[in-house]
């Protein structure tokens, strides 16, 4: 019965899931060059996904078999509100404190893998464990992949908001893994728990400082400052040499007689 709920929801709302997956991939690719814009867009996308999951799953199909479904549903609504607030704050953030530029390359890689797992790995794991294709869970509709994708995006943020914004996804993923285990879906429960743990590791990995990030970007793009070699017949330039009045070259330690 529980698996059938996702089939009902996906059959009616699959365009919403398709649009959410496409936007998540675009934002994931955009983050390399425009991290602040990508993170702001991710916050807005995740807010929409949590709101859709609350409305269509918790307040919709799940409530028909479990009246207590409204409680996690309201938690998802609150999460959507916090994500929208975070997106608004990001608009006015400036300077080194602005979002997103400081996740290390390792953190960005692990976070991206968690996002991709939520988008494609989670439904693939369900298919591999014998679930019918029509009842697979997809991002922006089902709560599990939505929480996984959120955890992946949040893990790549520099802002300390990522800890507070990760509470609802982590609590839901832990509760869902226990629910799946209780329903004798041990393999699905194990995959979900492992994905959550990987996301938590990425969440707590050290961040780069703004200076470290700038240095890593220079090394990656090959834009680090290099001194041009002297031209033929030209004396090599000595760092620190200055010109005195009358055109005479002096070193900083030289005193004019």
Regions found by a protein language model. Give the residues of each.
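Membrane-interfacial loop-to-transmembrane alpha-helix junctions, especially the N-terminal start
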Residues: 36-47, 103-111, 158-169
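N-terminal topogenic module of multi-pass integral membrane proteins
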Residues: 1-63
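Loop-to-transmembrane alpha-helix initiation sites
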Residues: 68-73, 182-196
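Hydrophobic cores of alpha-helical transmembrane segments in multi-pass inner/ER membrane proteins
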Residues: 14-26, 75-91, 143-156, 191-206
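Membrane-interface capping segments at transmembrane-helix boundaries
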Residues: 32, 91-96, 204-218
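Membrane-helix boundary connector in multi-pass membrane proteins
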Residues: 63-65, 155-167, 174-189
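Membrane-proximal helix-loop-helix units in multi-pass membrane proteins
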Residues: 68-150
């Amino acid at each position: 019965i529980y698996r059938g709920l996702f089939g009902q929801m996906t059959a009616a709302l699959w365009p919403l899931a398709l649009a959410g997956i496409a936007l998540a991939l675009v934002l994931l690719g955009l983050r390399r060059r425009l991290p602040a814009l990508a993170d702001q867009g991710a916050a807005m996308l995740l807010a929409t996904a949590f709101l859709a999951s609350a409305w269509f799953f918790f307040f919709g199909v799940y409530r028909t078999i479990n009246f207590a479904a409204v409680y996690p549903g309201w938690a998802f609504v609150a999460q959507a509100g916090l994500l929208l607030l975070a997106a608004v704050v990001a608009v006015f953030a400036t300077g080194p404190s602005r979002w997103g530029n400081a996740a290390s390359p390792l953190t960005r890689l692990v976070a991206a893998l968690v996002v991709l797992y939520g988008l494609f790995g989670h439904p693939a794991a369900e298919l591999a464990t014998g679930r019918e294709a029509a009842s697979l869970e997809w991002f922006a509709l089902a709560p599990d992949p939505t929480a996984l994708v959120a955890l992946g995006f949040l893990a790549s943020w520099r802002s300390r908001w990522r800890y507070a914004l990760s509470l609802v996804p982590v609590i839901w993923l832990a509760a869902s893994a226990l629910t799946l285990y209780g329903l004798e879906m041990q393999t699905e429960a194990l995959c979900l728990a492992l994905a959550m743990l990987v996301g938590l590791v990425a969440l707590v990995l050290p961040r780069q400082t703004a200076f470290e990030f700038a240095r890593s970007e220079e090394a990656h793009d090959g834009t680090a400052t290099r001194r041009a070699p002297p031209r033929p017949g030209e004396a090599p330039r000595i760092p620190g040499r200055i010109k005195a009045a009358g055109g005479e070259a002096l070193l900083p330690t030289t005193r004019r007689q």
